[in-house]
């Protein structure tokens, strides 16, 4: 099984959304085709996927706003976990963002998900204590 890490295409959007649902990722109101297609149009390199045998089995959003790099939606299919795909997706996101000029990267992680927080700690990223995230919409 050859694994490819690449930028997502518009045709990947249904598979990415299905991956998010099947993996148990915490849903948000922007988990829809229109939002992902808008992301790809705005920044064609932001959504990165892992593909095995022509099937999307992982994703990460590596968002660059010109100031700071943000990593969202790191998801790996349950059937492909513990194969190093999460780490490869994070490395692809880091490379994309650092190459774009980001000096600081941040990851948005569900605090109550021990699998996710454990993964991020294992990658060497540090939890920033004392900060809260405020959102609207």
Protein language model annotation of sequence segments:
Residues 2-16:
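A short beta-loop-alpha structural element at the N-terminal edge
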Residues 82-95, 122:
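Conserved acetyl-CoA-binding loop-helix of GNAT-fold acetyltransferases
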